[in-house]
UniProtKB/Swiss-Prot annotation:
It comes from Yersinia pseudotuberculosis serotype O:1b (strain IP 31758). The lineage of its organism: Bacteria, Pseudomonadati, Pseudomonadota, Gammaproteobacteria, Enterobacterales. One of its GO terms (molecular function) is iron ion binding. This is 23S rRNA (uracil(747)-C(5))-methyltransferase RlmC. [4Fe-4S] cluster binds at residues 3, 11, 14, 87. Belongs to the class I-like SAM-binding methyltransferase superfamily. RNA M5U methyltransferase family. RlmC subfamily. Coiled coil: none annotated. InterPro entries: 23SrRNA_MeTrfase_RlmC (IPR011825), MeTrfase_TrmA_AS (IPR030390), MeTrfase_TrmA_CS (IPR030391), SAM-dependent_MTases_sf (IPR029063), U5_MeTrfase_fam (IPR010280). It comes from the Bacteria. The keyword Transferase applies. One of its GO terms (biological process) is rRNA base methylation. Catalyzes the formation of 5-methyl-uridine at position 747 (m5U747) in 23S rRNA.
Amino acid sequence: MHCAQYAAGRCRSCQWLDKPYPQQLADKQHHLESLLAGHAVTQWLALVFGRESAFRNKAKMVVSGSVERPLLGMLHRDGTPVDLCACPLYPPSFEPVFTVLKTFIARAGLTPYNVARKRGELKFLLLTESTYNGELMLRFVLRSETKLAQLTAALPWLQQQLPQLAVISANIQPVHMAILEGEREIPLTEQQALPERFNQVPLYIRPQSFFQTNPPVAASLYATARQWVQEHEVHSMWDLFCGVGGFGLHCAGPETQLTGIEISAEAIACARQSAEQLGLKNVSFAALDSTRFATAEAQIPELVLVNPPRRGIGRELCDYLSQMAPKFILYSSCNAETMAKDISLLAGYHIERVQLFDMFPHTSHYEVLTLLALRR
């Protein structure tokens, strides 16, 4: 993949771009195998990868420049703006949208936030595309509500130019820190969730809910989890750190007792919407802390699925699972190092199978799916 900004030394987000893609994959596989070298793995499955470019469904654009000539992209370490509208990670459909958004910023009078001067209003634009129907979700991250009325008044023009814009919101982030978004989200359209569909499973993305940024590889990840679970005829399961419910909704059959737990109420609203659409009657989702929920339960399901943030599931949850001993633990991780530490704490389990999914080409990051079975 060629990137003009990388070649010019202006962007280093893809830190492995100089490395041939087959070598990237080999290095990731070697890294994972070295982390699990102290464990007996019954089956290593071939790694899964997708496109090298144009795979990202989401753009996070810093807004800089002036209101008349806004720039969308990032700030270089020296503070100068870098235009990323032509970033090769984005699908071709994004660049014309960015062109319209630049015009809209000027029309609406949304002054870009100046980090050095701590002045201005518009900090970021967050754009997400549905691979299911091509609809877009757009979030304006603002310092305050000062320009909200101007933004709202100008929206009809934007919606006329971009009819695929289905979900629009404003996020208020008043802090002068490198924080992408604040807690307060103000919906600006009646529709508040972007529909997505992986493997015939309907999923929904709300402004403040996490969703995978590489849809083709994410679809493979979910399909693999479903296959592994179905092979063991699991009748009851927990989906902890469940997000919008992608794993649990893929794995649950009509009779499966599924409980999904996620701290984000926005994500849980998405999961419930999907479960209702699928007609699943034995499924419940709740906005709770996954560790607190689990450790307060006196009974355990046959399978516990965990998909934690980079920090892993931690000692408390590992100790609880070791004590309660579900038949299976299905661990999906975006940080194999913390996953390996957690697995070392899970007493009484062996690794049945492991598979790497290259969700993040041109970086050292990857996703890994591991099935742990209770030793008999």
